[in-house]
Regions:
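NTP/phosphate- and nucleic-acid-binding module
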Residues: 1-356
Length: 356
């Protein structure tokens, strides 16, 4: 019945494929974990609203993960089979290649007609439903690890870090009970405030503890020694770099501020990388079916261009650049720009890249 729509379902499934290409952890695997939403709607317009909601969710999630992304409507030849259109979300990896981490598909009523999926409308007539799919995979974890990690290990965005703060007591010779007691008190205070915190009271050197937690990517390390205790303070070390002493007064607010700063530093670093990898496609001349570029096509670069040509011309550009069409950016040019092939003014903004 129309009263049952929209119908929205969510599932986590694992699928297997005989992957013939080189496998890479999180990026190209034989067992794939999909996180999928499947929806059915009364008409095309309502399904389109669902697509818009999905893209808003993606934007919010990627903002939390501090990952700038390319959002493109895939070309016809790269659209999911049976879909009216596909919109994909790609992260630009450290080597300049792109990694698709999510996609949304609008099917209109094409699958409903194939499988006779109908509903009864308000007038009692049978109508075909309009369907969408929104999904992600563990490639998202690969993007986090590769984009934010450094030579020391992981760097986890504070909103998704399993442990946001690690408290490390610095034990010196003599009575350590006060340092331990204060470390436990601070841990309890942060935990009560909803901060994901861990007290590391292992009987090993502080340097080894630092090393362990840096590898795991914990955003904030908090050190408490006899000197800090005497000064009513703690030493905070950010995983993104930098140390600063803070008073234990209003410590919850201080920690939240530090985590916010870490997130902003991660966002700036990833945004700087993202922007540095995107360039305008160099000018070229056409010699038969070959493109002769004024400048060499750089490895590890995502190119953008204004394009309003046909499929054959798109294929010629792919061949000439040895790159793939990601598709039309969802953020088109505000003013019309000449197409790189035809010269016809267009607002279509196309991205070219070497995808994983």
């Amino acid at each position: 019945s129309h009263a049952d729509l929209p119908l929205k379902t969510y599932q986590i499934v694992n699928t297997f494929r005989y992957e013939t290409k080189q496998t890479r952890s999180f990026i190209r695997v034989r067992e794939i974990h999909f996180f999928e939403a499947h929806t059915a709607h009364v008409d095309e317009a309502d399904a389109t609203r669902q697509i818009e909601e999905d893209l808003e969710i993606v934007e919010n999630l990627m903002n939390e993960l501090k990952l700038p992304v390319l959002v493109t409507k895939r070309p016809v030849w790269d659209t999911f089979p049976g879909a009216w259109y596909t919109i994909a979300i790609d992260v630009v990896m450290p080597d300049g290649r792109t990694l698709q981490v999510a996609s949304v598909h609008h099917y209109r009523d094409q699958w409903a007609r194939a499988f006779d999926v109908t509903y009864e409308d308000a007038s009692g007539n049978q109508q075909y439903v309009h369907q969408t799919t929104y999904g992600m995979s563990e490639r998202l974890l690969g993007a986090i690890v590769a984009s934010h990690g450094d030579d020391k290990g992981l760097v986890m965005p504070p909103p998704v870090a399993p442990i946001q703060v690690v408290v490390i007591p610095i034990i010196s010779k003599g009575d350590s009970s006060e340092v331990i007691s204060e470390s436990e008190r601070i841990t309890s205070e942060l935990k009560s405030a909803g901060i994901r915190v861990r007290l590391d009271s292992r009987d090993i050197r502080p340097g080894q503890k630092y090393y362990d937690w840096e590898i795991k990517g914990v955003p904030l390390r908090m050190e408490i020694g006899p000197r800090d205790l005497a000064n009513n303070s703690v030493m905070c070390a950010r995983r993104t770099g930098g140390k600063q002493s803070h008073s234990v007064d209003h410590l919850v607010d201080t920690v939240r501020s530090e985590l916010g700063t870490i997130g902003e530093e991660m966002k700036k670093q990833s945004s700087d990388h993202f922007n540095s990898r995107i360039k305008m496609l160099p000018a070229f001349t056409i010699n038969g079916t070959d493109l002769i570029f004024d400048q060499a096509i750089e490895k590890g670069t995502v190119y953008e261009m204004a394009f309003d040509g046909n499929d054959a011309e798109a294929e010629m550009i792919e061949k000439g650049t040895d790159l793939s069409f990601l598709g039309d950016s969802t953020t088109a040019y505000k003013k019309k720009v000449p197409c790189v092939i035809t010269g016809k003014p267009t607002t279509r903004r196309i991205f070219l890249a070497k995808p994983y």
